[in-house]
Amino acid sequence: APVNEDCLLPKKVGPCRAAVPRFYYNSDSGKCEGFTYGGCHANANNFKTKDECKNACH
């Protein structure tokens, strides 16, 4: 499991309706995966690139 507790937070799309491509760490699969972020009210498990996600969570 990652040392960084942010990586264990659930994926959070948020209430807004933008479609921003982002990555999150999926603690079930143990991988960083893409999702579509709504643009507001993110949690800390939200990364602009897959590499950023991997660096934070692997």
Curated annotation (Swiss-Prot):
Location of the protein in the cell: Secreted; Nematocyst
Gene3D superfamilies: Pancreatic trypsin inhibitor Kunitz domain
Residues annotated as domain BPTI/Kunitz inhibitor: 7-57
TM ranges: none
Tissue spec: Expressed by acrorhagi.
Marked site positions, Reactive bond for trypsin: 17-18
Disulfide links within the chain: 7-57, 16-40, 32-53
A Pfam match: Kunitz_BPTI
Any one Gene Ontology cellular component term annotated for this protein: extracellular space
Keyword field: Disulfide bond, Nematocyst, Protease inhibitor, Secreted, Serine protease inhibitor
Primary location class: secreted
GO molecular function: serine-type endopeptidase inhibitor activity
Note: Does not inhibit potassium channels (Kv), as well as cysteine proteases (papain and bromelain). Is not active against kallikrein.
Role: Serine protease inhibitor that is strongly active against trypsin (1900 IU/mg) and moderately active against plasmin. Also shows weak inhibition against chymotrypsin (70%), elastase (38%) and the metalloprotease thermolysin (14%).
Similarity comment text for this entry: Belongs to the venom Kunitz-type family. Sea anemone type 2 potassium channel toxin subfamily.
Protein name: PI-actitoxin-Axm2a
UniProt source species: Anthopleura aff. xanthogrammica (Sea anemone)
